[in-house]
Amino acid sequence: MEADGQPRRPWQTDPLIQMKILSVHNSYQKPGGEDQVFAQETDLLRSYGHEVLLYQSSNDQLAGKNALLLLGDTIWNQQSYRELRALMQRERPEIVHVHNTFPAISPSIYYAAKEEEIPVVQTLHNYRMLCPAATLFRDGHVCEDCLGKRVPWPGVMHGCYRGSRLATAAGAAMLATHNYKQTWSKSVSAYIALTDFARSKFIQGGFPPEKLFVKPNYLQTDPMPGEGKGNYALFVGRLTPEKGIGTLLEAWREIGRELPLQIAGDGPMAPEVEKASGAMESVTWLKWLPRAEILQRMKDASVLILPSTWYEGFPMIIAEAFAVGLPVIASKLGSMASIVDHQRTGLHFEAGDAIGLAEAVRWWAAHPAETALMRAQARSDYETKYTAEVNYAQMINIYESVLKRSVSKELAVPAGASKL
């Protein structure tokens, strides 16, 4: 009890005190980056002594349900609401951290937390709350047709989610319903955007700026820096159109032997990459490599190429590159432009501009002194932004900010008055 007679929670006097956190995630049929981040952050919080409760669902649980039931559950899953509310009543966590609710869990859980007066933090791993496809990308181009619209009808018309109007309609109905109910602004205490760019997009989409924090993803372990003596450029990732594979190959037709290119990855555009590798001596397709070998090639590479033509969420490959001291030549677009600092930790070029990429690579090959400095600066960015220790401090600061706001609201309610 303080001098003013008001109670204080333990974390207000000791910021390192252990908290009880309920972490919520709807995992994907094919494990991806969001699933990995969910697991990493759970382990990180537990390693600092916090108690982390888990509520998880999987898309596998949707098997056998008819379309109408799936649509209803995507908008409001009453079972999730009941289960989460019972769990919160039993365990009384101090905070609920949501990673993904789509499609099985649904936004009903925000209301369960609100009824129990427990603040909610939501990590924005993608753009799903702005776009039915979650990517802001359609037909090979950035698309913002649904951005800021209460009813995202363009997405349904184009069948943006999995190429299906019916599947897209489920996500669009969820967005329209909760836009109307003002769920995003009234039932979530704070959002975590992964980059400054993503934060700006959510503000543009109508999210309250004061609730939007920025916390990037991080690496669990430090791979340690390399020396970059391999004299080659490197691409690592899925071989898909939105990753800019066409731009990459076209640029190397211009570059020729000035700087060899190694491509590590597989995917739908593998035949085009294989053909280019056979036709150009300077291009080598490595197919998909084990993690340890990819890291070693990153340590030896001169520069990483990231020519994506969509906004990206948070490309972990950039954090990994910076960790080994590898600068990045990236599209001047979306999150890539937020993370890669032009002429400090890499270079930018206009997305889709193969000639611009070729010019950036030629500049790179001709300026070894400048690029050596960029290697050191890339490593410095990793140490100050993308380590587990830095990420933990950022996460706890966000939690504490949310909890302090929650306490302030409690104290603002006069004695005997009801809390709305």
Which functions belong to the PLM regions below?
Residues 299-313, 326:
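Acidic donor-binding loop of glycosyltransferase active sites
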Residues 342-343, 347-354, 363-368:
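Conserved acidic donor-binding segment of nucleotide-sugar-dependent glycosyltransferases
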